[in-house]
UniProtKB/Swiss-Prot annotation:
UniProt keyword annotations, A-Z: DNA damage, DNA repair, DNA-binding, Glycosidase, Hydrolase, Lyase, Metal-binding, Multifunctional enzyme, Zinc, Zinc-finger
List of residues binding DNA: H109, R128, R173
Active site per the UniProt annotation: P2 (schiff-base intermediate with dna), E3 (proton donor), K60 (proton donor), R282 (proton donor)
Zinc finger (FPG-type) residue numbers: 258-292
Descriptive protein name: Formamidopyrimidine-DNA glycosylase
InterPro entries with a match to the protein in the record: DNA_glyclase/AP_lyase_DNA-bd (IPR015886), DNA_glyclase_Znf_dom_DNA_BS (IPR015887), Formamido-pyr_DNA_Glyclase (IPR020629), FPG_cat (IPR012319), MutM-like_N-ter (IPR035937), Ribosomal_uS13-like_H2TH (IPR010979), Znf_DNA_glyclase/AP_lyase (IPR000214), Znf_FPG/IleRS (IPR010663)
Family, per entry: Belongs to the FPG family.
């Protein structure tokens, strides 16, 4: 599943490529991709003549701020134009976007297509079809419509995410620290890859009970999380199967991982073999010598 660095890579690509993109037509190729409104025609109607004004990210969600455009000759910028709600996207396991100039026939696994007046297309492709989209009317609360958004913990790059916050959040938790990092209500956007890599960087065993981790270790863990995530974003994220950026390119962070998917290979620090075991159903990679 795309995690924070992959979603942020997509967000940056969308923001760069879709400057002043006005949706003139929407084609829903798979109804189940539209999570809200329940009527796909309402989804299509709501998005038509909307300018994609700005792309944001919250955890693993992409959020497009929309502006209402009645006249194609409207002058930019449109800061003062009427809001037209939000387009929210969760890529889930295999979803990704493609931007196509002078659109052609849809490729296999195309789920939703957005067109501008010049027939440029923003295409959403999803092999396993778990991804979802929401059009949220300007009069509605995003957090009320999408329950998962409202329950997200702080962003790893935010001031709210620090050692003091972590210490309080885990003080009574008997779960492993790996399970804690995967809990989106505690910290938003971290998944299996970056939990493993961050714990390795911090020298903390993924099996440690969260409540046993000392504050000085949490300071190091928070720093490691930020460093690992920034490094991955700089590499365009990680591609092991379906993830692509807007240009169709793979992420390169997978070539730099220290433990993730390196089972049986030598630790880059100590030479000990990397091991793998499941924690709460998720494959976990670590170095028993470097992580305590």
């Amino acid at each position: 599943m795309p995690e924070l660095p992959e979603v942020e890579t997509v967000r940056r690509g969308l923001e760069q490529k879709l400057n002043n993109f006005i949706i003139k037509k929407v084609e829903v190729c798979r109804d189940s991709t539209v999570a809200y409104p329940s009527n796909k025609e309402e989804f299509i109607k709501g998005l038509k003549n909307s300018l994609i004004y700005k792309w944001d990210r919250r955890g693993k969600y992409l959020i497009a701020q929309l502006k209402e455009v009645q006249n194609e000759n409207t002058e930019f910028p449109l800061e003062n134009s009427q809001n037209n709600g939000f387009l929210v996207v969760h890529l889930r396991m295999t979803g990704y976007f493609k931007f196509i100039e002078n659109s052609t026939h849809p490729c296999k696994h195309t789920r939703i297509r957005f067109f501008d007046k010049n027939n440029n297309e923003l295409r959403y492709v999803d092999v396993r079809s778990f991804g979802q989209m929401w059009w949220i009317n300007k009069d509605l609360s995003i957090n009320k419509v999408i329950k998962g958004l409202g329950s997200l913990g702080p962003e790893p790059f935010s001031k709210d995410f620090n050692a003091n916050y972590l210490k309080e959040a885990i003080s009574k938790r008997t779960k492993s620290i790996k399970a804690i990092l995967l809990d989106q209500t505690i910290v938003a956007g971290i998944g299996n890859i970056y939990a493993d890599e961050s714990l390795y960087s911090a020298g903390i065993s993924p099996f440690r009970e969260a409540r046993t981790i000392k504050k000085n270790e949490l300071i190091k863990l928070k720093k490691s999380i930020v460093i690992v995530l920034k490094k991955s974003i700089g590499s365009g994220g990680t591609t092991f199967s379906d993830f692509r950026d807007l240009e169709g390119e793979n992420g390169n962070f997978g070539l730099q991982t220290n433990v993730y998917r390196r089972t049986g290979r030598e630790c880059r620090k100590c030479g000990n073999l990397i091991e793998r075991q499941k924690i709460t159903g998720r494959s976990t990679h670590w170095c028993p010598n470097c992580q305590k």
